[in-house]
A protein has these predicted regions:
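Ferredoxin-type iron-sulfur electron-transfer modules and their immediate structural context
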Residues: 2-139, 226-244, 331-335, 345, ...
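Residue-level detector of alpha-helix initiation sites
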Residues: 79, 146-148, 171, 274-276, ...
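Glycine-rich dinucleotide-binding loop and its adjacent helix/turn
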Residues: 116-134, 195-213, 235-287, 390-405
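N-terminal Rossmann-like FAD-binding beta1-loop-alpha1 element of flavoenzymes
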Residues: 139-162, 277-285
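Rossmann-like dinucleotide-binding cores of NAD(P)H-dependent redox enzymes
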Residues: 162-165, 169-200, 204, 256, ...
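A conserved short coil-to-beta-strand element within the FAD-binding core of flavoproteins
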Residues: 206-217, 323-334
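Rossmann-like dinucleotide-binding core of oxidoreductases
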Residues: 235-244, 262-322, 427-435, 443
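FAD-site-proximal beta/loop scaffold in flavoenzymes
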Residues: 244-265, 348, 352-419
Length: 443
């Protein structure tokens, strides 16, 4: 079945080190925490944070240097503290809803959460169990060991439920490991978080994949409930001429399989404007590409990628062509160049977002050795073979409790067309755990 032996190699790749706490570090943290107004309304928590972390309360504990208590407070809603503190789009979520931000800079919530997560690592703090009566004989299978599956597993195991994760790879973490480059998220942080989840009693079966060596009907017979959390890992395509040429890759597959070609002295074009596009561009640059170009059809202020990540990419030499669209990839057998067309942004009736429209006659070509599509993700076609209702876009259909058309099976995260962030995936996982526990209490 696999024992996760590969996990050691993957999770011990060199990455940025955590900042060790010293006097100066503590002073900066205290200054950041003192800036918080401890609002009673808590828009940062109730409106901004997908996980509804009790932000004012954990920051209050930091002010009083009660770091263990701050960690306990965060534990009530999340098990990904040091991770979300680093990679969440804080400016669009918690910090974007901070009252301080109305007339100035918001509280640096991300740094404070990361600080508490790091404190827990340095002081070997564990997740606390709160076992409920009559749950210890209940069994749940979770398909997928990414942020959503891991979060669901942790919140179930805390209550005493027997949880088994079925993971298609030989390591846990999902996109936390292969989808987010080491320079953004150190893998020792991911490993520590997963180790603590496994210490709750969660079991893992590696190299298990639905549709191949794992049968959902057999799992139904063995478990009380099943949670599908294996994500949407197939890169979307533009369906343009030349997209099947040698040298055209999907961004998700490239990051996941880490099977990059030799980029040295090559020109690489990335199509997209999200964090995957930025991550791929910065990764390719680090691997020696001569020129890295991102093509994005809208304006800079409309890029869904984090502002800081975009800025960092540009500082590293990544060129971004805003308001451009790829219309054709040219080459005989292999990519030689791409044809671009400039766009203008127009307000279409009924749309709240400006739409890009190609400017006729503005076509031009750009040399390219490789083209990487980073246009978002879609679910694998085999989802249709699970015997569950799906939407027209091939997402699994669920009700408000995340139950599928089979009430015994739940689904969440990108499988149901989620919002594409780690925090939202984790929120789905926590909600599913809570809903399953409520189901158990009925019988």
């Amino acid at each position: 079945i696999g024992d996760g032996s590969f996990q050691k190699n993957v999770l011990e790749r060199p990455g940025p080190k955590r900042t060790k706490r010293g006097r100066k570090m503590n002073q900066k943290i205290q200054e950041k925490s003192n800036y918080c107004l401890n609002c009673k309304i808590k828009p940062c928590s109730n409106k901004g944070c997908p996980l509804n972390n009790n932000i004012p309360e954990f920051i209050k504990q930091i002010k009083e240097q009660n770091y263990k208590e701050a960690y306990k407070i965060l534990q009530n809603t999340t098990v990904l503290q040091p991770i979300c503190g680093r990679i969440c789009p804080h400016k669009k979520q918690c910090e974007g809803s901070c009252v301080r931000g109305i007339k100035g800079e918001p509280v640096n919530i991300g740094d404070l959460e990361a600080f508490i997560g790091d404190y827990a690592i340095e002081n070997n703090l564990k997740f606390e169990k709160n076992i409920e009566e009559n749950l210890e004989n209940k069994k749940v299978a979770i398909i997928g060991g990414g942020p959503s599956g891991l979060t669901c597993a942790a919140f179930l195991a805390k209550k005493g439920v027997k949880v088994t994760i079925y993971e298609r790879k030989d390591f846990l973490g999902g996109l936390l490991v292969y989808g987010i480059p080491d320079f953004r998220l150190s893998k020792d942080i991911v490993k520590n978080t997963m180790d603590k989840i496994l210490e709750l009693g969660v079991e893992v079966r590696y190299n298990q994949e639905l549709g191949k060596n794992l049968n959902i009907n057999e799992l139904e017979e063995k478990y009380d409930h099943i949670y599908l959390a294996f994500g949407a890992n197939v890169s979307s395509k533009m369906k343009i001429e030349g997209e099947n040429l040698d040298g055209v890759f999907g961004g998700n597959e490239l990051l996941e399989n880490n099977n990059h070609p030799d980029y040295k002295e090559k020109t690489v074009v990335i199509n997209g404007g999200g964090n995957v596009a930025i991550d791929v561009a910065r990764t390719v640059k680090r691997k020696g590409a001569k020129e890295v170009i991102i093509v994005y059809r809208r304006a800079k202020e409309q890029m869904p990628a984090e502002e800081k990540e975009v800025s960092d990419a540009e500082k590293e030499g990544v060129k971004i062509l805003f308001q451009n669209n790829i219309v054709k990839i040219n080459g005989t057998d292999k990519v030689q160049n791409i044809e671009l067309i400039k766009t203008e942004l127009v307000q279409k009736e009924g749309d709240t977002r400006l739409s890009p429209v190609n400017i006729e006659g503005s076509n031009y070509t750009v040399k390219a050795d490789y083209v990487i599509m980073a246009l978002g993700s879609k679910t694998d076609e085999f989802v249709q073979n699970l015997g569950l209702e799906v939407t027209p876009r091939n997402y699994i259909k669920v009700n408000d409790n995340f139950q599928t058309s089979n009430s015994k099976i739940y689904a969440g995260g990108d499988l149901i067309g989620g919002k594409g962030t780690v925090a939202w995936a984790a929120r789905n996982g926590r909600d599913v755990a809570e809903n399953i526990i409520e189901e158990f209490k009925k019988y």
